[in-house]
């Protein structure tokens, strides 16, 4: 708090002329702001989704418009919205045709897991294991990427089938073996992993299902016991300080094999890294999200870009059950243009952003019946307009978070429709918010959970 107070004062007094910050930096009291650079503008983390909903990237553009100064949106994998704005002339486009220092792009290939399955109980295919071995022989570094924290996303009993679920959320508890805990990644609930099943009482029959980065690290050590292995994940003991030290160690070449989540995809420079293996390239494609293909393309492009940044010959290998998926084909061929053309055409056909407008309405309450009743009453109070219609209500994919039951409505409108006015009238004509009911409105939602 003291540091924030000092920065606030120094910016307001003009003592600080350049600020590098997160979303909240937009609200500092600049007197002579003349430029905003939004780095990695495609990153969904720019959208705040609790309490006050806003997209910092869009707020930066608005602030630049109000102050009549330039705003730079930079990304190697721009969002579809930004891409369309550049194509239509709303934004100027400056293309960077090559990597820094003219470094060659990595050679990319898909490993078809139907033809090259991992060994029983493992998650690394024979071609990927062989590629790691050859990289070690050359005394170069490998990165194994899996966007899943912890050891395993699900723990169950082999005897009765009991699954460990958060008592306050509709999500499975994730085993974190390094910490000996089961953790909810939605609300933060933690509990010690028991030795016996709480349902049937059977000892030593709890099994981990699926991999997280900790489990991949265990498999790597089994294959390469002499290699220096490091796990990079945001929730490891030691916090930000430990993470910074470990990133520095990787950059200095003090690790042979790195296993990491999406934080390793964010602009880090590892000079001796020449192999990137994506353990599960299909992970994001199954999400019920209109941006699922775009997000997967961006994430995989960014993480494979960690290889060969200093000019060394490098490779990126994507383990997938869908090698013919348009996202996989675009990444392997290096043809980003075809991906964007296809994605933009599909969005336009479906009337999805940026060719249409969306608003999410999330109704939550202490009881399921209360949340559902309010959501249905809200829907009955709204009549579809000519260019706007309402979908739902339906139970949210994450139907219980922090002890609150959740239902969602989705308002979809044409690009020039007055969506905010429609939602405002819908809330005014609907039932009054009483008891434990809470209603949140998310214009242009980035998450549909």
Q: What do the PLM-derived regions correspond to, one by one?
A:
Residues 420-421:
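Charge-rich, low-aromatic oligomerization/scaffolding segments with amphipathic character
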Residues 443-449:
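Short, charged, intrinsically disordered terminal tails
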Residues 404:
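Juxtacatalytic substrate-recognition/specificity segment
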Residues 390, 424-426, 434-441:
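Structured alpha/beta or helical-core interaction and ligand-binding surfaces enriched in interleaved
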């Amino acid at each position: 708090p003291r540091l924030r107070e000092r920065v606030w004062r120094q910016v307001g007094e003009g003592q600080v002329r350049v600020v590098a910050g997160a979303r909240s930096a937009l609200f500092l009291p600049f007197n002579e702001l003349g430029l905003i650079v939004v780095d990695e503008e495609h990153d969904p983390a720019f959208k705040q989704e609790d309490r006050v909903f806003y997209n910092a990237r869009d707020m930066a553009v608005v602030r630049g418009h109000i102050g009549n100064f330039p705003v730079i949106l930079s990304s190697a994998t721009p969002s579809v919205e930004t891409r369309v704005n550049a194509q239509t002339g709303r934004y100027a486009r400056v293309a960077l045709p090559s990597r820094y220092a003219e470094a060659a792009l990595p050679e990319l290939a898909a490993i078809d897991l139907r033809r090259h399955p991992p060994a029983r109980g493992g998650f690394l295919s024979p071609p990927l294991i062989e590629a790691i071995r050859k990289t070690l022989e050359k005394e170069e570094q490998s990165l194994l990427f899996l966007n899943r924290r912890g050891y395993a996303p699900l723990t169950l009993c082999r005897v009765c089938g009991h699954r460990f679920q958060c008592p306050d959320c509709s999500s499975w508890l994730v085993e974190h073996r390094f910490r000996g805990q089961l953790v909810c990644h939605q609300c933060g609930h933690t509990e010690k992993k028991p030795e016996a099943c709480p349902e049937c009482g059977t000892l030593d029959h709890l099994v981990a299902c699926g991999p997280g980065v900790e489990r991949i690290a265990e498999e790597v050590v089994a294959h390469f016991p002499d290699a220096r292995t490091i796990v990079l994940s945001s929730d490891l003991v030691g916090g930000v300080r430990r993470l910074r030290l470990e990133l520095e160690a990787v950059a200095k070449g003090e690790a042979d094999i790195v296993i990491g989540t999406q934080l390793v995809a964010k602009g880090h420079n590892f000079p001796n890294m020449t192999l990137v293996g994506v353990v599960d390239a299909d992970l994001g494609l199954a999400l019920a999200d209109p941006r699922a293909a775009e997000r997967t393309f961006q994430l995989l492009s960014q993480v494979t870009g960690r290889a060969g940044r200093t000019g060394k010959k490098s490779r990126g290998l994507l383990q997938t059950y869908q090698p013919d998926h348009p996202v996989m084909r675009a990444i392997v061929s290096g043809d980003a243009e075809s991906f964007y053309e296809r994605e933009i055409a599909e969005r336009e056909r479906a009337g999805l952003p940026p060719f249409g407008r969306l608003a999410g309405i999330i109704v939550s309450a202490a009881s399921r019946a209360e949340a559902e009743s309010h959501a249905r009453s809200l829907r009955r109070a709204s009549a579809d307009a000519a260019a706007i219609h309402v979908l739902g209500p339906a139970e949210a994919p994450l139907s219980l978070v922090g002890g609150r039951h959740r239902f969602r409505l989705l308002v979809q409108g044409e690009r020039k429709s007055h969506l905010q006015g429609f939602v405002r009238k819908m809330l005014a004509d609907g039932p009054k918010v009483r008891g434990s009911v809470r209603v949140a409105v998310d214009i242009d939602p980035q998450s549909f959970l």
